Amino acid sequence: MDKTQSSQGKCPVMHGANSAVASNNMDWWPKALNLDILHQHDKKTDPMDPKFNYRDAFNSLDLAAVKRDLNALMTDSQDWWPADWGHYGGLMIRMAWHSAGTYRVADGRGGAGTGNQRFAPLNSWPDNANLDKARRLLWPIKKKYGNKLSWADLMILAGNVAYESMGLKTYGFAGGREDIWHPEKDIYWGSEKQWLAPTENPNSRYSGERDLENPLAAVMMGLIYVNPEGVDGKPDPLRTAQDVRVTFARMAMNDEETVALTAGGHTVGKCHGNGKAQDLGPEPEGEELEAQGLGWLNKKGPGTGANAVTSGLEGAWTTHPTQWDNGYFHLLLNYDWELKKSPAGASQWEPINIKEEDKVVSVGDPNRKFNPIMTDADMAMKMDPEYRKISEKFYQDPAYFSEVFARAWFKLTHRDLGPKSRYLGPEVPNEDLLWQDPIPSVDYRLDASEIVELKAKLLASGLSVSDLVATAWDSARTFRGSDFRGGANGARIRLAPQKDWQANEPERLQKVLKVLIELQASLSKKVSIADLIVLGGAAAIEKAAHAAGVKITVPFIPGRGDATQEMTDVESFAVLEPLHDAYRNWQKKDYVVQPEEMMLDRTQLMGLTAHEMTVLIGGMRVLGTNYGGTRHGVFTDKVGVLTNDFFVNLTDMAYNWKPAGSNLYEIVERKTGAVKWTATRVDLVFGSNSILRSYAEVYAQDDAKEKFVHDFVAAWTKVMNADRFDLA
């Protein structure tokens, strides 16, 4: 046999790290710290030009023209995916709803803000079946308007226009959502290994009676909300009502908003289950190349229009599924309902003895009519006592229902867009809403000389470097890049609930705030407490850097306002409470998750990279900002001086590192055996993890003293300005 024949059938390429058959580091060492969540959305993956600014691009968009095109699309039925009753409104609303509906208030992740429905896993979730068709229908419009209109904005706008085209007066629309270019790595969707895994399966998201794992909101892997057939697919409206209440609360919705959204979402459109689910092909990510990113293709027939299969339930909720009306409550409340099976075998509720005029015209044959249907979640709106009261009120007052729904829909689709200062476009409502975390604008300016004078007064106030730095940090660290909440702007650290959070050391905080408020009152110039808090941190860092022999000016841009208690929803802000903070070497209690894992999660939410995290930890330790003044990780004899001592001593082989208790270690001199310092896991991980050690070594080098200070200041400034959307 010659060499040519013997080599036939072998793979012609070397298997690299991108090969599906290759094992990666996490396969070999599953307990290793995975820094990937800090390394996502790199500019290398972004196809936009370096100078591209989406805000500027969107502001140049003719939004009215886009809406005209979207209105035309709604009734321009395509043969490859026909519109139900000649109107795509229901499909577009479901797409927008499911884009926004992944948001959860606990960590601010999910939601409509990034266009992530285009990528795995969301593009292939069972609950998102056939939304790939909705996005393909939108492609001509996305293609036409190009970079002026992100997919993220287009999907929400399409849902808005769909409602408007069917008769609802919407509350408004804001653009400003920038697309990502690959799946997110930081969002925890659950630990289940199969779609729609029931509660009793391994790795369930439930414990106890029915306690849903934090921060999850959906009841099953692959669902946006609740199971439409009932808890674990077993119909029981009262049990489902409990799931609905928990799920919507974790999306920051109250009972009235929940009923409005459920009813308003089901006033239009239909469910699809007129066929066999087993006839459908794989989801988009599991399909073959020739499917070109589409999934759920019917292998035994057209599988479109009247024969489409999506959820498995079959039918519309209302008599007129292409118009906005009060028909949902008319049918739900005036008829008795019984359990039936759809053609696909799914459990659904249908009315008993329904009048002919209340039936729904068939999608495929205008001469035929069918029963409307309700899901188990819809029946919960009737069976649950509290939901029933709200449903009755909406039924009796259709105008009130329309208004509440329009506002709830706006909240649903804009919750993760952040404060109103990030909103773009001519349809932004004028009203300031409490859930937008409003902050009053400022009416003063500070020039360079006034800033210098203020810094001198702050340093002469009697507050220490650690007090000023820790207070500024505590004020700013609440920022979440997931939904753009929190941060130093507004100075809500002086208001409930933040002033009483254990993480903020209330007694120390009140001492610092008292000094700052007195200083503010003594000034001839108007300055917000929010600006004074941040400027105090800047002044303290400059002093600490100067003591280390490095002269530097910490960038400071005034303009932060002071929020009032009336502008602050205490319950809404409660989810921002830090339960751990590696930067101040503190956690409220021991958790199942290791401290270093929680450090990465907090770091990612603040929008920091791995090397920014590294330099900030090292700087915060030597500045003496540990919670309660503990000495863990303070590897220096010059506390309050901004040196690179943390890294120098961390990487020094003159020391041994020994466990001394739960999350506690002793740093021992090798020669004498004497304990030199103590440390926690979030200190020693910078010497243990190979990636973090590589950063630590950079800052430990003899030529790194100035670089360390400059990098620390840059990372610090990034945190302080994270919520300054007015500077974008």
Swiss-Prot record:
Q: Which Gene3D superfamilies match?
A: 1.10.520.10, Peroxidase, domain 2
Residues annotated as site: Transition state stabilizer: R94
User: What is the active site of this protein?
Assistant: H98 (proton acceptor)
Name the needed cofactors.
heme b
Give the signal sequence positions. Answer: 1-22
Please give an example of a GO cellular component term from this record.
Answer: cytosol
- Similarity comment: family membership: Belongs to the peroxidase family. Peroxidase/catalase subfamily.
Instruction: Describe the task this protein carries out.
Output: Bifunctional enzyme with both catalase and broad-spectrum peroxidase activity.
This one is known as Catalase-peroxidase 1
Query: What organism is listed for this UniProt entry?
Result: Shewanella sp. (strain ANA-3)
